[in-house]
């Protein structure tokens, strides 16, 4: 990995069809505007099916009724998922009230889905409501630009740090990076906001005419919390503070979790440390990382196009030196930092400014009025009286931020009355799933609908072995693309087929180690049998403070993944 050129800087060969699509799209316009007026289908045609992703949307259908509709000779019930751009997950109560109303009035499912990319999604937007959703977002100062496809996606930022003044500084940087790396095309404004076409030619000085080779994810993280799971991301800025003031960042590049079942050219990878940079170089370095990946990333094979593969192909040192050259700096040695956890601190936490933050556990991030737990109504009622903001966390929870002492009791009463503060065990708080069925077209197995009952069973195992208040970081992802971040969990389930999963073990609590596959293509009873035995051993044999993942490695149950490019599949 330290050789100058383990592989070529640029991969020669026939470009993937996605590259043709981007090149011919006229800076992401395609024929989306014309397609919107085609009432014969609920979906988008041809290239537009993929181009709408650059505008923050995915075309989906309800897979629960797909076969039934096919039998009736009907096309699938097409509807769009829309993902908002929300750097750092901060949303005002005015914005919240607007999205609450849109979800209720204009989506099939009526829900707001908080995601582990620290934003919200609407599921089930019919084609006739696609333009109105963008206009609604714009009216409250939001957009969905660049939240999907080959761009820098929503920038994450630690939600509830131990030093709250650091959050304000780090959050400002998350916003600046997001804005700096946005596409410059006017396609979004023209298509969705009816802004006039301008005679000037579009230019993309950072992203280029064909944008990035693949999705690109960025974080700003404030130790000791690794709530944003930095090792799942392409570019990570670890905040370094002196006397409570942000002075610079450690840069880590090349994390990513997506794999393809059976494709040994794909693997999950933790990010590599490049070095420390003072604050004034932040945007130049961020741009240099992105443009290096733009120019060197593999455009012939999308399965091998992410930054992690570029680093492995050209060598970490070569990539780092190119970033230094483009940014005009030399990285200083990495400054010391450590992580102690990545879960959210559920409940009230007092900030340094004497205001309070209330973190609410939202199982799988799904905000809806459930029987006996009207969560969506409760949050709307809080939004009506709260003077501060809401923050969406990368664990799919919600923080009512900056609550003055005088409002605390009133907000707590509303939260309790609407089931937003029901007691849950630590295991549930540390479990997470992606959406998967029925809306995700890539889903191979259930995730969000499977996790609550599966967690019940894991809690029963913990109880049986006398450790009911312990927790294991547990994630379920419906397919190997890995949106549920199972590849950084202590127990990771990756969907293989309906009712079947690959079981990965050996990650750690702080999210710095990739888990290895322990058993392949097994059913829930098989998974529970394995976990029952191993959790029993952990309860008896663990050392003081030893997490489940660390125990499985120390006890020789699983070999740790040390160099994923070479040993992930062993």
UniProtKB/Swiss-Prot annotation:
Alphabetical list of Pfam families matching this protein: NIR_SIR (PF01077), NIR_SIR_ferr (PF03460)
Residues annotated for [4Fe-4S] cluster binding in this entry: 434, 440, 479, 483
Q: Endoplasmic reticulum as a keyword? A: no
InterPro entries according to UniProt: CysI (IPR011786), NiRdtase/SiRdtase_haem-b_fer (IPR005117), Nit/Sulf_reduc_fer-like_dom_sf (IPR036136), NO2/SO3_Rdtase_4Fe4S_dom (IPR006067), NO2/SO3_Rdtase_4Fe4S_prot (IPR045169), NO2/SO3_Rdtase_4Fe4S_sf (IPR045854), NO2/SO3_Rdtase_FeS/sirohaem_BS (IPR006066)
Might you name a Gene Ontology BP term for this protein?
Answer: cysteine biosynthetic process
Cofactors that this protein relies on: siroheme; [4Fe-4S] cluster
SUPFAM superfamilies per the UniProt record, alphabetical: Nitrite and sulphite reductase 4Fe-4S domain-like, Nitrite/Sulfite reductase N-terminal domain-like
Q: What is its EC number?
A: 1.8.1.2
| Gene3D superfamilies per record | Sulfite Reductase Hemoprotein, domain 1 (3.30.413.10)
Recorded hits in PANTHER family, A to Z, give: SULFITE REDUCTASE [NADPH] SUBUNIT BETA, SULFITE REDUCTASE [NADPH] SUBUNIT BETA-RELATED
Output this protein's name: Sulfite reductase [NADPH] hemoprotein beta-component
Recorded source organism is Salmonella paratyphi A (strain ATCC 9150 / SARB42)
